[in-house]
Amino acid sequence: MKTLFIDESGDLGTKERYFVIAMLVPQRSKRIVNFMRRFIAQNGLSEVKGTLLTTPQKQNLIHQINTANDCVISYIVVDKNNISNPKLLQDKNIMYNYLLSFLFKNTIKHANEDISILLDNHTIKVGSINSLADYIKIKAYTQWGFKYNIHVGFTDSKHSKMIQAADVVANAIYAKYIYGKNHLYNRLTINESIRFPFNIFGK
């Protein structure tokens, strides 16, 4: 089974221009989980949150995530200033589901095994998890030619070291688009970056 770990940086409100969703797909999640545990213990933390880390701490974690070349990193960033239909931003769950479909497409389309998708439970309303699962399954089975099982679940990030790792990655990507800080972003090995809306992003 292939597992997709999802976390985001920013929000879908009007405060900041960009919103980022990052996806980590590890070949060996145990390696990442182990060094995340060590990092938490060494720094006296209860949970890793990208916004609360120092730059050296973020550098350390990003280096560890990349070091074995066994984790695929992808992301989608949305330019909220160029969303033409305001309804998409009024219903944040619909917008979130829509963005995730672009982020998941290539991974699910080329997978030859069951897929598990795990999100932070602070991301969407609990009652919306079923609508997300149904939406992704419809896309996968009717448009992407996927023939295996898909499970969508959510957990509190404090219980998932992989979600915490995704948070650090999302934070580094967010800093690039919001603050123009490329230092951490350039240390990431990005498999796929999606800028939405496609033709007018950043204009």
Question: What is each stretch, according to the model?
Answer:
Residues M1-K203:
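Phosphate-ester processing/binding pockets and catalytic centers
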